[in-house]
Regions:
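Alpha-helical transmembrane bundles and membrane-interface segments of multipass inner-membrane proteins
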Residues: 1-152
Length: 152
């Protein structure tokens, strides 16, 4: 049951943060937090992570919906299994983050990002993220680690 609620929780939490970013952050405004290591700023991303495919919003939207459908099906197939908690967690985080970003893209034509980091390589410093991006990343990292372990 929790595995079907977690994607909804991610979706709602990030939706609230995106709304707050839209309402309270001005264009080009940067608010440093955590001793300047993290920066809050509003960015409208019409493409995928890093801004790729910005001119193909509808294609990205369709592909995302298709992939999310497959992930939901996989999560449903694991529903009754007790030993697959880590796999279910990875799927639930990925689905929740994907749903939130898909919804933004579907309703607005862009995804609202609001967090940057002031450390690491310059390319990394230029990227802007949202909570859904982190959930997708950690969910996919967990699923990859499980897959690597199972293939041994």
């Amino acid at each position: 049951m929790i595995w079907t609620l977690l994607p909804g929780a991610v979706f709602l939490a990030d939706g609230c943060l995106k709304k707050k970013a839209e309402e309270e952050l001005k264009e080009n405004e940067q608010i440093p937090v955590c001793k300047g290591h993290i920066v809050l700023r509003k960015c409208h991303n019409r493409g995928v992570a890093g801004g790729g495919f910005a001119d193909s919003t509808k294609k990205v939207e369709f592909l995302t919906f298709f992939l999310l459908s497959g992930l939901w099906a996989r999560l449903g197939a694991l529903a009754g299994r007790r030993k697959c908690k880590a796999k279910k967690l990875g799927l639930a985080l990925t689905i929740g983050g994907g749903m939130s970003n898909w919804y933004d893209r579907h309703k607005r034509g862009y995804v609202t990002d609001y967090v940057s980091f002031r450390f690491g390589p310059e390319k990394f410093r230029r990227l802007v993220f949202n909570v859904s991006d982190f959930c997708i990343f950690f969910g996919l990292a967990l699923l990859t680690a499980i897959s690597c372990r199972e293939s041994r």
